[in-house]
């Protein structure tokens, strides 16, 4: 992609502490992004709450803030530094949530900060469970029966509509599935859904039919602003659905699928990243 001369200063959000859902790969990708931006002549402002990372080394960025990764802090730093653009895609779920909130509350527009990489529409489509399902349906991707809910009454009605147990609860805009789980009865459903609604930034959970025991695959897909896309890596979880992918044993590349199966899944992954309009790297679970 050509260099943009209208941008002078770019703020990069780190991912914070290493934990399930945000592991060391975000430190590596963030470090590479900072180096690439500086090599292209941009001034880089890095904000990260974890001092024990490569990207926080003094020589990495022009300006480094070791501050909490929360919207109020990022907004305050933007008011001080006045960056031209914000790059959140290298900071994982935490950074994407911050960027989405700052865009929705008007802070980015008020401060004249452009969200680069994946835009707000792409973030919302990937993180909002209802919007994501609509995108999948629009391009003909098969999905399990699922209903997006914003209240406990809707959760109970959705469970009745699905009509079988167990039921999966998936909160929107949370890190590593925080607040989600599998409910085997009504009591567990109420308990997990209450936690999920509380942890979701938009108070939304997806009530989904069970796919426990199914095989889980992961496709790392990269796409640029000119719509060039490629599969970087394929991975196969040894443990079935029901074991958190952060705790599952994973092998790369796919081991038990034929090339014909891989080509079908590859095409679906590429169609999805294009439909979501994601620019950068995306991990697609299948």
Regions found by a protein language model. Give the residues of each.
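N-terminal beta-alpha lobe that positions the nucleotide/phosphoryl donor
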Residues: 1-283
């Amino acid at each position: 992609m050509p260099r943009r001369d209208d941008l002078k200063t770019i703020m990069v959000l780190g991912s914070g502490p290493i934990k399930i859902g945000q592991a060391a790969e975000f430190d590596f990708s963030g470090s590479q992004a900072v180096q690439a931006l500086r090599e292209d002549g941009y001034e880089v402002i890095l904000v990260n709450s974890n001092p024990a990372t490569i990207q926080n080394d003094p020589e990495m960025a022009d300006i480094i803030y070791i501050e909490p990764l929360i919207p109020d802090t990022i907004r305050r730093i933007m008011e001080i530094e006045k960056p031209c653009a914000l790059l959140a895609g290298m900071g994982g779920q935490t950074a994407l949530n911050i960027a989405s909130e700052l865009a929705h509350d008007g802070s980015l527009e008020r401060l004249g900060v452009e969200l680069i990489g994946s835009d707000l529409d792409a973030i919302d489509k990937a993180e909002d469970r209802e919007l994501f399902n609509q995108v999948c349906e629009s391009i003909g991707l098969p999905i399990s029966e699922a209903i997006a809910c914003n209240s406990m009454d809707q959760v109970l009605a959705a469970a009745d509509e699905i009509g079988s147990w167990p039921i999966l609860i998936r909160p929107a805009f949370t890190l590593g599935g925080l607040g989600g789980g599998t409910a085997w009865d009504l009591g567990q459903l109420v308990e997990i859904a209450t936690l999920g609604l509380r942890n979701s930034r938009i108070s939304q959970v997806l009530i989904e039919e069970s796919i426990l025991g199914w095989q889980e695959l992961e496709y790392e897909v990269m796409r640029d602003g000119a719509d060039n896309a490629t599969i970087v890596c394929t991975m196969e979880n040894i443990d079935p659905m029901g074991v958190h992918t952060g705790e599952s044993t994973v092998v790369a590349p796919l081991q038990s699928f034929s090339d014909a199966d891989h080509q079908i899944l590859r095409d679906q992954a590429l169609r999805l990243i294009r439909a979501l309009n994601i620019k950068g790297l995306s991990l697609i679970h299948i």
